[in-house]
Design a protein with these regions (language model features):
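Glycosyltransferase donor-binding loop in the core domain
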Residues: 1
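Beta-propeller fold recognition
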Residues: 4, 8-378
Length: 378
């Protein structure tokens, strides 16, 4: 369905405010709409507006595409007036308010929007696509025209082979890190072919990128962008060597980890893939994966495989607790198999006690204790 709608939701009488349909003008790029819009505020040319930010959606050519190739629709980011439905701004690879030459793959996931100074107005957008790319778009509130929003591709984790044709169907989770001299936004996301959950060819991964450009300005006062990060600039944390009992192995891992732009984990079980957004809480990353059943013969068959839950350190991908209760914290403690079959939904958090929030993965829940120091800081 190439349309978007927004309604006034009253207790008894909800009503549709407007409907947006793709196919012409600036909305030619609007594909199948999969994700929830992000509702926020921006100051556009001195006027504060309620806005709806959405990705361009999905191009169903991705359903059976084994190699990475440009999409016809979906490769856009739209900002609409949330009160009237009018298009305020959009980005794509051409014929847009912000042309980004690398924005050539569809964007079905939710746009992650950051209000860095808690003034109610959005400042940054993080955008992931089905080409395995990640973009950051920066909003300069109060400006207009070409000065209103700038952006760039900041990572490319896809490739041009069947094995490296990684796709992001879901938006990242993002949090600010300020530890001594280290200032960056931690951007966490995982790859997986949602349209073909039973695929076992693509080598999918989970990534945590350190985006330091949001703390640096150029001579014109604009936020900076790192040169596009690829896996070669990331630390492969799969072996859990940073916590090795072997001193030499640990030292080599620490040297390899130093000055990297983040880390990633190979999803090593055959066909394992991420099919939901992660959740960052208390400097830990929760995410789920899906492992297809080996015996299935149809790429479109109902999912009957299993799901796994990961809990890792946001800083380095290490395990953070003794999950299997064997008295040691090692690589095996990153993940646990879920009882539920099929594809697990996104991680949700329920907060009744701020120190012990409950994290739920579908129907299975666990308490996540947040450590607080004597000054009350977590």
């Amino acid at each position: 369905d190439r349309s978007r709608g927004l309604g006034d939701v009253y207790k008894r009488q909800p009503k549709l405010k407007f409907q947006l349909t793709g196919g012409e003008g600036a909305l030619t790029k609007l594909g199948q709409t999969w994700s929830k819009p992000t509702i926020t505020k921006v100051n556009m040319g001195g006027v504060v507006r309620n806005v709806m930010i959405v990705g361009g959606g999905y191009d169903d050519a991705q359903d059976d595409r084994s190699l990475r190739a440009n999409d016809v629709v979906g490769n856009a980011v739209y900002m609409f007036d949330a009160d009237t439905g009018s298009l305020l701004w959009h980005a794509s690879n051409e014929n847009s308010d912000l042309d980004l030459s690398h924005m050539t793959y569809s964007i079905p996931g939710r746009i992650s929007v950051i209000d860095r100074d808690n003034d109610g107005e959005a400042d940054h957008m993080y955008v992931s696509d089905t080409g395995g790319q990640l973009f950051r778009l920066d909003i300069y509130n109060g400006e207009s025209g070409s000065d209103f929003i700038n952006g760039a591709r900041i990572a490319d984790f896809g490739g041009d082979t069947e094995e490296t044709n990684r796709r992001f169907y879901y938006g990242p989770d993002v949090t600010e890190i300020a530890l001594g001299d280290e200032l960056y936004y931690a951007v966490a996301l995982g790859s997986g072919w949602r349209a073909s959950p039973l695929d076992t060819v693509v080598d999918d991964n989970f990534y945590m990128l350190k985006d330091s450009g949001v703390f640096k300005r150029d001579e014109n006062g604009k936020y900076t962008y790192m040169t596009t990060v690829t896996e070669s600039k990331m630390y492969n944390a799969t072996s859990h060597a940073l916590n090795s009992s072997d001193e030499n192995e640990r030292a080599l891992a620490a040297a390899a980890f130093a000055n990297k732009d983040g880390w990633y984990l190979n999803l090593t079980t055959n066909g394992e893939k991420v099919l939901s957004s992660p959740l960052i809480i208390d400097y830990k990353v929760f995410f789920t994966t899906y492992v297809p059943a080996v015996s299935s013969t149809s790429a479109c068959a109902p999912p009957t495989g299993s799901s796994r839950a990961y809990l890792v350190s946001m800083f380095n991908g290490n395990a953070v607790t003794d999950v299997n209760n064997d008295g040691e914290v090692n690589g095996d403690d990153r993940v646990a198999d879920l009882k539920q079959t099929g594809i697990a939904p996104e991680t949700k958090i329920l907060i009744e006690d701020i120190v012990s929030p409950v994290v739920c993965l579908g129907t299975e829940c666990v308490s996540a204790v947040i450590e607080v120091d004597e000054d009350g800081n977590d």
